[in-house]
């Protein structure tokens, strides 16, 4: 199967391209073929003469009477091609007289010849189209008919619009024709020109004396632009024209006619006169700050300057001039060709008007003056702003006596004020002082009361100790005087009792038994129980207190002479031993020898003090000191952490006690420990 040759590559079109209408992008088309002389003569398009595919030739001269529509083609157009929209022929322009417009003969531009690959078609021939290439065979064996070919037709050519109007003057440039004699090539007449005089009325008369005011230079609207350039305003320095404003066409320098008017109305108006500032307050000080008008001479000079610069400008009357005044005559400048023979009338003095700040209406002058006078009088007689010294003003007082009286009164008020401040300050100082003294007195009373209470407590305690001492001495003497036949026991307690009473009770109880002990039985029971429970090997023995409930239970049981110690805690038994020594009514070392004991520094002094104590007390020491020395041995101390110093520190309060409370108890405790340590070291 032979391959079809590729379609010829078309070159870029060389003709014109229509602008897009209604947002439809038109494709460029090839230039139409050049029309023949016969077609030009008959003013017909090639579409009517030739084929249905050749585009319409543009015609330079449009005949309104000849308008024909091309027949519709039988070939199906592509969806992308532009629709064949019928275009209306523009209306025939007419001139001012109602006749056909005046046209100018223009040279027809010759279109370039069509490309070589475009073949001319006859009405009976069909267009040559490239063959359709089928990319895939049909599904069935039957051969399907090929789809109709798609022909891309060029869009219809645009309707030739008439050329822009060209102004052709019918006469020479020396004499300007009227607006009615001007002819436009496009058929559009120029608007009539209305000239106005200095008084504002229309000037329709032609004055031969001043050709510049009544004649219009020839207008030339060239075919390139069709619109004259904008005028420019300048001042002519010619004395004959009186500095009148002129409008000159900028194209006049190129030789074309220009439009000038020396008596035209000025385009620029002078700025409005300054409006004086208004104050919203009735204060005369602020009301006096209005912008006052200048002097008459300055105003006349300014207005003369304005008149000399712009004679053709009619200024309106100033807003502050009373027009109803008979002296006011508006000044109107004369014509340009006439000299000024009269001087302007005198300027009426301008006075600022008082206007309402709400609706900007003029206030009644007389009423305003009355209000201003009333306000000034009120301000001068008692409503002046406050001064350094309130309530009074020296300006109000007219005589010197009143001023002196006022000054004296002020001085008196100042003295009274200072006196009140001084009294108030003294009163405050006295109150502060009294309050401070009262507070110090209360603190001193509290201190005295506290000291008194402490002294009472000391005296009461000392008295109680003396009573106890006297009572114990009397009881001991009475017990010694008892007959042997009397078997009554005064105190059977073992704790909180004297050593002599405990030994007497113990002898009475041991009379029934064959053996007797020289020291209390409780010492033997407690020390043996501690050794049986491995007390010396228990860490912190005699230093760690046992259970308080167990100690109280066993204490009550021993006081009832029940010596069955049913406990397995060596700390409870060690606590009972220390408690018995502390609760003795008289300590083992008598209180009379306390000061000598803490002052002893050698073993001889300690031996001398021991020789002075009673025999029963010596028996207790002879039993207790060897036991303490045994417990503090080094082979026990490595387990119990209780060496001789620690043991002496624990038992010194039970062996030595002072009956007088002093502040040197902590210092004396060290001396007590040294005394007990010396006793333990002296033990065999």
Swiss-Prot record:
Residues 497-684 form the Rho-GAP domain. Residues 1-283, 292-311, 403-489 are annotated as: Disordered. It comes from the Eukaryota. One of its GO terms (biological process) is signal transduction. The record marks 543 as: Arginine finger. Residues 54-84, 94-110, 118-131, 168-188, 197-226, 233-264, 293-311, 472-486 have a biased composition (Low complexity). One of its GO terms (cellular component) is cytoplasm. Residues 399-473 form a coiled coil. InterPro entries: Rho_GTPase_activation_prot, RhoGAP_dom. It holds the Pfam family RhoGAP. Its main location: cytoplasm. It is found in: Cytoplasm. Rho GTPase-activating protein involved in the signal transduction pathway. This is Rho GTPase-activating protein gacO. It comes from Dictyostelium discoideum. The lineage of its organism: Eukaryota, Amoebozoa, Evosea, Eumycetozoa, Dictyostelia.
